[in-house]
Amino acid sequence: MTGSKMLFACLALIAFLHPLVHVASAQECTTPNNKAGKCLGIRVCKPLLEMLQTQGHAAADFLRQSVCKYENNNPIVCCPNEESREDRGILVGNEYEPLRPPHCGFSNVSHTRVVGGKPAVLGAWPWIAALGFRYPRNPALEPLWKCGGSLISSRHVLTAAHCAEINELYVVRIGDLNLVRNDDGAHPVQIEIESKIIHPDYISGVTKHDIAILKLVEEVPFSEYVYPICLPVEDNLRNNNFERYYPFVAGWGSLAHHGPGSDDLMEVQVPVISNTECKNSYARFAAAHVTDTVLCAGYTQGGKDACQGDSGGPLMLPKKFTFYQIGVVSYGHKCAAAGYPGVYTRVTSYLDDFILPAMQ
């Protein structure tokens, strides 16, 4: 059995196991390495989050053994006390691999059906990244935020190639809610980009292979409001065309065609349509390439879609209590124009040949 399959099997068993740590009371516990701790939600346990972000799959067995219990399918783990934190680096490993539930894709917010675009609430999309660009004539100014992305590991952000190819792109901000206010309760992380990995077959100005990965200069510290999204690596997701599903898209893009970007993080839910229907919609546009490497989502009547500034952001599918990224915002006609769905790079088409190798 491969390492990935072993990990998946290991995590799948957690829900059926009794707690593996010794729990002395409702709060106190003993960690797998015999340190005193308290049972907390994994999203607020900094030592285990640090282990997860730096050691990835290598941390899986220790994390599995740290489970105290589950509450509403959310793992409660034995979090070491402050004096025990020097022992957190127990495991070895520095490869960045796709994380699996429950270590990704968890949102603090219950998402009901969104029938129209609306502002997101704090903690709803902890993996959403705003991409920052330098002003060519005045690099000292604050970044210009004009593309989106998603955190997929502690060092990698997934985005669109047509965003990554711009020379002025240099920084990402993750976990923000309002890009200009500091009183929104968010605690965003802003980290510069070390390198850009653009799909080798992408050609500037052409809509094919519109996908890229940004490697950051340092680890992103996971927290309650900064957390990665899951990639659709399981077979039941890889082999799904997602037609008639209603995924979410979120970003700080324009609210109208050629309008200014939104300061507030906005979200909308859109239905995935067939590629045949999508191809017919874009038949008169020679530059539109609707192939099996993209998926399309939107309403026939228009009015709800990703827009300028949302480019590179994630199309997010909820499965039970976990969100998976199934698309990357690529292009559309105007902004939520009637008869023209949004076109997204299909993540499952690029997992093995591009995304996973680029994360190593």
UniProtKB/Swiss-Prot annotation:
The active site is at 162 (charge relay system), 210 (charge relay system), 311 (charge relay system). Residues 114-360 form the Peptidase S1 domain. Keywords: Blood coagulation cascade activating toxin, Calcium, Disulfide bond, Fibrinolytic toxin, Glycoprotein, Hemostasis impairing toxin, Hydrolase, Metal-binding, Protease, Prothrombin activator, Secreted, Serine protease, Signal, Toxin, Zymogen. Gene3D superfamilies: 3.30.1640.30, Trypsin-like serine proteases. Expressed by the venom gland. GO terms for cellular component: extracellular region. Residues 1-26 form the signal peptide. Residues 27-113 form a propeptide. SMART domains: CLIP, Tryp_SPc. Multifunctional venom serine protease. In insects, it acts as an arthropod prophenoloxidase-activating factor, thereby triggering the phenoloxidase cascade. When injected into larvae, it induces a lethal melanization response in target insects by modulating the innate immune response. In mammals, it converts fibrinogen into fibrin, activates prothrombin, and also degrades fibrin. In mammal, it may act in a cooperative manner with the serine protease inhibitor Bi-KTI (AC G3LH89) to promote the spread of bee venom under anti-bleeding conditions. Negative results: does not activate plasminogen. The clip domain consists of 35-55 residues which are 'knitted' together usually by 3 conserved disulfide bonds forming a clip-like compact structure. This is Venom serine protease Bi-VSP.
